[in-house]
């Protein structure tokens, strides 16, 4: 089988086409990452006018800081909850809508609505519903004797930010899962049904293996979302409290750099977070993707 190779009239045209993306990558990714790495090795004054090379002292101080270690483990727990809860809930709804025959369009539209809501607005929405004094959900919980106050209870605060973050991401995951389920040939599903496989067995033995590549893609995307894009939710809902119970690494970087004006510590934390995400992504690509098999 012969391979097709595009031929350009000018040898500079391919480089010209790639140039805009390269410029964007350098300006918005490589340059900031390089500056963060440089500042992490410096002792910088609060206004950034003077600096002194200190080597790895910022990293040593970082891992001797109990508050940073708490934020590190909070990030791991928070990211795991957001990633796996979001994937499971989205897959469940996608499977239900795929199974529904009548009113499918209505449910699809309903599931996509949260994606149009900004993260900070989503957090404020759920704060109103979980307001300890006037919230509709807290009033309902109070009828069963459960007191809710996420401003004082660290477990409830964590639940609130996880819940709001998952709700915001459901639409994105649903869109990909539903499209993947719709792409499965109906003939395969009908053949499995004729062989006596029920809906649940068809899902686990047929549909789930066939959408494994999409599941892997969403696993990586949701992990990055939990690490970085949940900052507005945490800032609007709990501001990292109570007692730093919901302070993740990305929120601690913001607080150290923009509130505390400790640019060196903030840069060192950024570098650690960057390498952590890179390591997790590489592990997923090497070990999780290798498990993707069709049955």
Swiss-Prot record:
Q: Where are the transmembrane segments?
A: 12-32, 81-101, 110-130, 158-178, 208-228, 263-283
Known role: Part of the ABC transporter complex UgpBAEC involved in sn-glycerol-3-phosphate (G3P) import. Probably responsible for the translocation of the substrate across the membrane.
- Indicate the family of this protein: Belongs to the binding-protein-dependent transport system permease family. UgpAE subfamily.
Return the protein name: sn-glycerol-3-phosphate transport system permease protein UgpA
Q: Which organism is it from?
A: Salmonella choleraesuis (strain SC-B67)
Supply one GO CC term from the record.
plasma membrane
What domain of life does the UniProt record list for this protein's source?
Bacteria
Q: Where in the cell is it found?
A: Cell inner membrane
